[in-house]
């Protein structure tokens, strides 16, 4: 539990370490659910029921309930299928599941954010990050009891499907500051060589085998999940392609000396299933065999796969999958729906009624000012702004956080793309508040153990930024 990415411990058989992680994850889940249930007394009004059934909060929720019941346009959609499956499993009706499930899944979003902060540097500080995300106004308002809609999964899946690639990248790739040091050392300055030369060599020596079967399985499964999410929402095809491009870019730019081809090969374990589906998980199985370092035949296979012309052919295949379908046309169409002002329509004649554009009339797609956007990240503008600035620091120290960059962009683009995007900024601000505070406390309180510092970080953030807004 030191100031290192959790991926460093992936190869260690440290049962206590992982049990501690499970414990704090359950604490995050329990606290998030308890805080979410503070709204439960408000539902005791009989007017909020229809017979024995609670009324759902949005028309979209009834859209998915209808699909789960077997009629309407939502039949066969994953949201309706999931609702039907959970209702059958629990022996109840879809509308009851649609009422309770938003509060439950939003708690698992808190757990995923906790896991991200754990991976980026501190297990215990992740508790505060998870709760800050779960209770962020922009996410909370769209995931209250009865709000069964795609907002639940559009934040959950991007956090889930990128966690393993981020950990893998941080485990086997160079940190940005290390790259800068190498550039300075390579410039020929004698003082720089004396200052950093030995430390650079030591950090290169700790890098292990990026094709270990555990990593390959995690990358492959994350890729299949990424591919599957594209059936849930139109935003996922863009996010998955960004993730593939980022992993390839990091393998090219941040690879230690002599390991670029090996990292490009390992990145394919994620890229191919992400773009091609479960069928390409077979390539991950091939990489698992190539990762066995003790077998001479497997070593030869790995050497052959790492040849430049083989990698070029494989990545050309990734490129063809990347551009398959009418991707560019779809992207242009989707952006125009969000960003272009629709023309006002109406009838002819002097007394004709003038109708506002339907899309721009909806609250969730109205453009917001920057201060309004910050208020959706956290009720205090100053805290939200500090979180955004802190996230920049996190990116510099933990390049795996680059996988979260699209969420930051979507959150800030609420000024042009509408208020429904604000929830994407919640985990960004949470990460940007917790980790920098944890690192600063480590510097100030050097005698404290890292786990105690993490607990102190969570306690301070919960007392200052959560308790005042939940009447604790």
Residue ranges of predicted features:
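Membrane-interfacial, low-structure loops and terminal tails that flank and connect transmembrane helices
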Residues: 1-18, 172-221, 263-267, 296-310, ...
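Start-transfer (signal-anchor) and selected internal transmembrane alpha helices
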Residues: 1-48, 127, 288-319, 454-459
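Membrane-embedded helix bundles of polyisoprenyl
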Residues: 28-35, 101-116, 125-200, 212-253, ...
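Short hydrophobic/aromatic helix or loop-helix immediately within or flanking a transmembrane segment
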Residues: 60-93, 100, 104, 151
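Transmembrane alpha-helix segments characteristic
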Residues: 214-222, 261-269, 307-319, 383-416, ...
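Alpha-helical transmembrane segments at the extracellular/periplasmic loop-to-helix junctions
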Residues: 238-245, 279-293, 309-403
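Hydrophobic/aromatic-rich transmembrane helices and adjacent perimembrane loops
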Residues: 281-289, 410-448, 452-455
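Signature aromatic-anchored transmembrane alpha helix within multi-pass, membrane-resident enzymes
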Residues: 308-317, 437-471
């Amino acid at each position: 539990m030191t100031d290192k990415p959790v991926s460093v411990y992936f190869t260690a058989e440290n049962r206590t370490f992982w049990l501690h992680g499970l414990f704090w994850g359950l604490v995050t889940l329990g606290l998030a659910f308890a805080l979410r249930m503070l709204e439960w007394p408000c539902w005791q009004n009989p007017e909020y029921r229809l017979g024995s059934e609670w009324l759902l909060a949005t028309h979209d929720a009834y859209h998915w309930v209808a699909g789960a019941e077997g009629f309407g346009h939502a039949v066969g959609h994953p949201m309706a299928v999931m609702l039907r499956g959970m209702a059958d499993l629990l022996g109840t009706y879809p509308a009851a599941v649609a009422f309770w499930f938003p509060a439950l899944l939003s708690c698992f979003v808190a757990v995923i954010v906790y896991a991200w902060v754990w991976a980026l540097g501190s297990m215990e500080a992740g508790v505060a990050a998870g709760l800050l995300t779960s209770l962020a106004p922009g996410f909370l308002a769209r995931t209250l009891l009865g709000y069964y809609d795609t907002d639940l999964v559009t934040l959950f899946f991007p956090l889930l499907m990128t966690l393993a690639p981020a950990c893998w990248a941080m485990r086997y790739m160079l940190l940005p500051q290390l790259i800068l040091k190498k550039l300075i050392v390579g410039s020929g300055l004698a003082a720089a060589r004396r200052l950093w030369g030995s430390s650079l060599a030591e950090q290169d020596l700790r890098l292990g085998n990026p094709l270990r079967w555990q990593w390959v399985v995690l990358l492959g499964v994350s890729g299949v999940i990424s591919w599957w999410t594209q059936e849930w929402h139109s935003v996922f095809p863009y996010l998955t392609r960004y993730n593939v491009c980022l992993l390839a870019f990091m393998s090219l730019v941040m690879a230690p000396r002599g390991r670029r081809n090996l990292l490009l090969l390992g990145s394919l374990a994620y890229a191919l299933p992400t773009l091609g589906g479960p069928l390409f998980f077979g390539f991950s199985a091939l990489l698992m065999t190539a990762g066995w370092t003790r077998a001479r035949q497997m070593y030869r296979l790995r050497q052959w796969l790492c040849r430049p012309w083989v990698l070029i052919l494989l990545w050309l295949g990734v490129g063809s999958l990347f551009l398959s379908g009418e991707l560019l046309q779809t992207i242009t169409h989707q952006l125009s729906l969000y960003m272009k002002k629709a023309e006002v329509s109406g009838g002819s004649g002097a007394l004709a009624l003038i109708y506002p554009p339907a899309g721009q009339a909806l609250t969730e797609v109205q453009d917001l000012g920057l201060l309004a956007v910050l208020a959706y990240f956290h009720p205090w503008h100053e805290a939200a702004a500090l979180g955004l600035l802190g996230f920049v620091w996190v990116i510099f120290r933990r390049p795996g956080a680059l996988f979260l960059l699209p969420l930051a962009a979507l959150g800030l683009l609420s000024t042009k793309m509408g208020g429904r995007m604000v929830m994407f900024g919640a985990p960004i601000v949470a990460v940007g508040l917790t980790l920098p505070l944890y690192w600063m406390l480590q510097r100030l309180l050097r005698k404290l153990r890292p786990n105690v510092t993490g607990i102190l970080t969570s306690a301070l953030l919960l007392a200052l930024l959560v308790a005042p807004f939940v009447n604790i």
